[in-house]
Amino acid sequence: MEKFNNIAQLKDSGLKVTGPRLKILDLFETHAEEHLSAEDVYRILLEEGVEIGVATIYRVLTQFEQAGILQRHHFETGKAVYELDKGDHHDHIVCVKCGEVTEFHNPEIEALQDKIAEENGYRIVDHALYMYGVCSDCQAKGKR
């Protein structure tokens, strides 16, 4: 995404445009297929020569989550990871050996969740599905 669009996105979210916010948003745009922790963000920005405090990163990530720019997840590692909220629903399969995260969408699972909710008198407003297993690479390496 272009910097102009990032500025507009921050303003549309009611956030003041600041250097740290732009850097962090740009980082998530360039790593759009990854799930990044606050520590990952800090490490990547340091490698790029950007001086920013860890507390600032945590604060910006929280603000972005509240503004609907990022989604937060808690996978097997126990630490929060973030990804851009692209507006599309998807679920996750996480490798318990190497931490690889695979996103997927399955209409059959979605329909079954709706059916279960309806049978129990609920209407789903949100959900998160995390499946844990061993990826094919780790299986091949014998990390069962």
UniProtKB/Swiss-Prot annotation:
Keyword Transcription regulation in annotation: yes
Pfam families registered for this protein in UniProt: FUR (PF01475)
Residues binding Fe cation, per UniProt: 89, 91, 110, 127
GO molecular function: DNA-binding transcription activator activity; DNA-binding transcription factor activity; DNA-binding transcription repressor activity; transcription cis-regulatory region binding; zinc ion binding
Keywords: Cytoplasm, DNA-binding, Iron, Metal-binding, Repressor, Transcription, Transcription regulation, Zinc
SUPFAM superfamilies, per the entry: Winged helix' DNA-binding domain (SSF46785)
Region (Dimerization): 87-144
Residue sites binding Zn(2+) per the record: 35, 83, 92, 95, 98, 103
Main localization category: cytoplasm
GO cellular component assignments: cytosol; protein-DNA complex
InterPro entries: FUR, Fur_C, WH-like_DNA-bd_sf, WH_DNA-bd_sf
Localization, UniProt: Cytoplasm
Region (DNA-binding): 1-86
Gene Ontology biological process terms, A to Z: cellular response to iron ion; negative regulation of DNA-templated transcription; negative regulation of siderophore biosynthetic process; positive regulation of DNA-templated transcription; regulation of DNA-templated transcription
Function: Acts as a global negative controlling element, employing Fe(2+) as a cofactor to bind the operator of the repressed genes. Regulates the expression of the fbp protein.
Family of the protein in this entry: Belongs to the Fur family.
Subunit field text: Homodimer.
Protein name as annotated: Ferric uptake regulation protein
Gene that produces this protein: fur
